[in-house]
């Protein structure tokens, strides 16, 4: 607003360039769209990201391995430690997850599709779009159902509306159901260039519409014989294919098993923390939000209620927690399990006045190591955060825990995926579980070889331990990563998680 008022508004007289409007250090480059959106003002000429590539050197560790080293690793004093790691590209010249956002926001052609066509704005100064191939697609609940190729010739500096004969919704969605329909158009290279092969995607646009012909009837639960036992230390439901155990002493679910394959090592734990990013360190987030590091991890159970459901075919359990913060803020975790071993899980935070904004809120779940595949319907394919969503597509994507652990020069928060509708966590054979958003909500998730504390403690990638588990995070919310600078600028207010507002994680778990 200040930039617009002083330089770009009615009183502006000169072109305006932001020398360094984004500092891309570590998991960063959040809020970049707030600056690129200023292109709507004729006097705005853009700005610069600091910078293109991390600066780091390969260093022999003396044990036959190498690591990317930074300030202080060569016994240099004084130094700026990892402050050389501020690139959109990693030091080995591979793209970081931030590149997904930068590429889309810097695209010279803007595509805005809807149900009947696409509006194309060509911001190039000299070249038309004649040499590009445009592909239109329709996805229903993330699955491509139709596509067609087009050649649109939009002159430089022009905006043109092009009609597209997308299929009718009634031809795609059953009249007795509901779905999320995504209309997508992308621009690709029709021929190879010196810098990219034919078919390389330059930019894309999506429009998402929710359609429903549903009569409101709930899906029937299909289940065989189930044995419900509420006596002893655990209450459980046992079937011929699996079991769910809800502890009366441990504060949650202690077994979630199908065909002998266990998904729980310890009951899922509350989390109100994330491994600090470089921007978090630079703006003092660790000091300001120190209480949240321990609040979830050391929360204590203050009440437990486990009983059969009214029909006698299921179980429900409510666990009351106190966070380990100054006010002992209450959190409620509720499980309800039906005869098909479908678990409805909610985690509710009521809000706490006069507290620093939360880094994150939800659950962190330790899984056996073999469950290292993540397939999800949400924003991807790369990691996304509340202030870094514009480069992501809505679709179904497959990742591994190792792939999602971005090798930032200093280990930190990584791998988060926003606006997730469902996620499947499986082994190499497809065995595992599915997490589905419930209650009209979305959730954020990550699956990594390391816990948040492991990432927080390591100073280099080679200091992370040998993976022995995978760590699943299911979050109601996580704050953005920021990116204005790495020496004081906070995450913009609209991308923080206010402590005085209620939060609720609402999901269904299925084996």
Regions found by a protein language model. Give the residues of each.
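Glycine-centered small-residue hotspots that permit tight backbone geometry or close packing
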Residues: 71, 87, 199, 379-380, ...
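Residue-level signal for short segments within beta-strands and strand-turn junctions
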Residues: 51, 138-140, 189, 367, ...
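Beta-strand/loop-rich accessory regions of lumenal/periplasmic or secreted enzymes
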Residues: 166-178, 193, 207-511
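Extracellular and select intracellular beta-sandwich modules with Ser/Thr-enriched
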Residues: 146-148, 200-205
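Extended substrate-binding grooves/exosites of carbohydrate-active enzymes
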Residues: 1-115, 119, 123-130, 135-137, ...
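Beta-strand-rich binding/interaction modules
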Residues: 118-153, 160-165, 176-190
């Amino acid at each position: 607003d200040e930039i617009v008022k002083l330089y770009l508004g009615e009183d502006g007289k000169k072109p305006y360039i932001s020398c360094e409007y984004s500092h891309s250090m570590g998991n960063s480059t959040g809020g970049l769209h707030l600056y690129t959106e200023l292109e709507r003002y004729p006097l705005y000429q853009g700005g610069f990201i600091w910078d293109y590539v991390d600066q780091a050197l390969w260093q022999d560790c003396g044990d036959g391995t190498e690591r990317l080293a930074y300030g202080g690793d060569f016994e240099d004093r004084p130094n700026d430690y990892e402050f050389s790691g501020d690139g959109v590209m990693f030091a080995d010249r591979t793209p970081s997850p931030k590149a997904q956002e930068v590429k889309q926001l810097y695209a010279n052609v803007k595509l805005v599709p809807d149900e009947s066509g696409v509006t194309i704005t060509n911001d190039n100064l000299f070249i038309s779009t004649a040499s590009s191939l445009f592909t239109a697609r329709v996805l229903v609940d993330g699955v491509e159902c139709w596509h067609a190729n087009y050649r649109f010739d939009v002159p430089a500096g022009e905006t043109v509306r092009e009609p597209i004969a997308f299929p009718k919704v009634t031809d795609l969605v059953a009249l007795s159901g509901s779905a999320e329909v995504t209309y997508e158009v992308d621009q690709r290279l029709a021929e190879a260039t010196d810098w990219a092969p034919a078919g390389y995607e330059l930019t894309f646009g999506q429009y998402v519409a929710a359609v429903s012909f549903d009569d409101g009837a709930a899906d029937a639960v299909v289940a065989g014989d189930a044995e419900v036992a509420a006596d002893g230390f655990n209450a459980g439901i046992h079937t011929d294919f699996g079991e769910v155990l809800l502890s009366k002493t441990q504060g949650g679910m202690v077994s979630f098993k199908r065909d002998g394959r266990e998904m729980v090592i310890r009951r899922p734990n509350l989390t109100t923390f994330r491994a600090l990013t470089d921007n978090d360190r630079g703006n003092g987030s660790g000091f300001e939000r120190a209480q949240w590091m321990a609040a979830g991890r050391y929360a204590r159970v203050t009440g437990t209620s486990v009983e059969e459901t009214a029909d006698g075919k299921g179980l429900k359990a409510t666990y009351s927690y106190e966070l380990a913060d100054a006010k002992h803020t209450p959190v409620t975790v509720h499980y309800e399990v039906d005869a098909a071993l479908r678990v409805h899980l909610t985690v509710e935070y009521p809000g706490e006045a006069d507290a620093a904004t939360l880094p994150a809120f939800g659950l962190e779940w330790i899984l056996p190591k073999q469950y290292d595949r993540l397939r999800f319907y949400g924003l991807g394919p790369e990691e996304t955060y509340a202030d870094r969503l514009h480069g992501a597509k809505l679709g179904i994507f497959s990742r591994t825990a190792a792939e999602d652990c971005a090798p930032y020069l200093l280990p930190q928060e990584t791998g988060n995926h926003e606006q997730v509708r469902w996620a499947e966590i499986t082994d190499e054979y497809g065995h595992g579980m599915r997490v589905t958003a419930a209650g009209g909500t979305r959730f954020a998730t990550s699956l990594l070889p390391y816990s948040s504390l492991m990432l927080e403690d390591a100073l280099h990638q080679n200091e992370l331990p040998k993976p022995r588990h995978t760590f699943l995070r299911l979050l109601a919310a996580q704050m953005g990563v920021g990116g204005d600078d790495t020496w004081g600028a906070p995450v913009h207010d609209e991308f923080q998680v206010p402590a005085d507002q209620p939060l609720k994680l609402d999901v269904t778990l299925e084996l």
